């Protein structure tokens, strides 16, 4: 790849609040999108997904486009987030993986040895089904509505591979990390091109921003994150940075890791609900200088009713403004501190967006 690459498919956005905020500009309104906004909270999602597995739906262009667009139509959010799953790049590379209802991604064969790492397939090219879906999405979005692509960060993917599926304690992952560090580093290095090529495929198709999700990073100490994870997330974000589009970095339960994660290189840092935004901004700015903040409403507050919800939204917006005024942040994108909970009432999400925009 050249030093700077602007894909031919890249469209020109006009007064797009998400992109303006991510670039440190003043948006026309408080920008908002929600993680997992496309999903089980929407009755229309349940209808179109009926009888189709999660992973299969991620490789069906018309269906993934429809699901991506549903919350934009319903809620008036400022961005669509590509409907996908963090294990899609693994499946596209040829790894045996399924998403089991009520459990999550389950691997046919866990990765436990150096030989397993060497046999792990690498995604070499693009993912045409996803690219076709992105084309359909972009045809419907206005020039003020962004499309955010995403990928799972290497630590989270590595943990799924080593554990063989979801884990409460990540004991096999940490055992490899400390007991067989050579194999651990080999696994992380092998995942990097698969993640980069997945994001490159989305970028080539025309997405407007990317988010790197590190769902399980919050289980790590700062020392372990810095030694065993940071170099690989940094490499991925550096590669994406060559395409000159906003990069968002988010992990769950990572309040104590915000400074370390900010070193990986992104314009936007996602913050979960456990840390006030102004405090999060201080931690980030102390290490990497001021960045744009994203977050951080507790998803459970969408069940609380209009008055307490409004109070929380106003508090979060005030904390973000405090961070900006103090020089610790350069902007704010409103989001949840994690994903929309499956049993959230769709109308309550729409109401939250309206309150945020007001």
UniProtKB/Swiss-Prot annotation:
**Catalysed conversion reaction:** uroporphyrinogen III + 4 H(+) = coproporphyrinogen III + 4 CO2
Q: Which InterPro entries has this protein been placed in?
A: UROD/MetE-like_sf, Uroporphyrinogen_deCO2ase_HemE, Uroporphyrinogen_deCOase
The protein's matches in SUPFAM superfamilies, at most eight in alphabetical order, are given as: UROD/MetE-like
Q: Where is this site: Transition state stabilizer?
A: 85
State its location(s).
Cytoplasm
**Main subcellular location:** cytoplasm
Q: Which domain of life is it from?
A: Bacteria
Stated EC number for the protein is 4.1.1.37
> So which residues are the signal peptide here?
none
Q: Decide whether keyword Translocase is in the record.
A: no
Query: Function, please?
Result: Catalyzes the decarboxylation of four acetate groups of uroporphyrinogen-III to yield coproporphyrinogen-III.
The record, for PANTHER family, names: METHYLTETRAHYDROFOLATE:HOMOCYSTEINE METHYLTRANSFERASE RELATED, UROPORPHYRINOGEN DECARBOXYLASE
**What family is this?**
Belongs to the uroporphyrinogen decarboxylase family.
Task: Report the protein name in the record.
Answer: Uroporphyrinogen decarboxylase
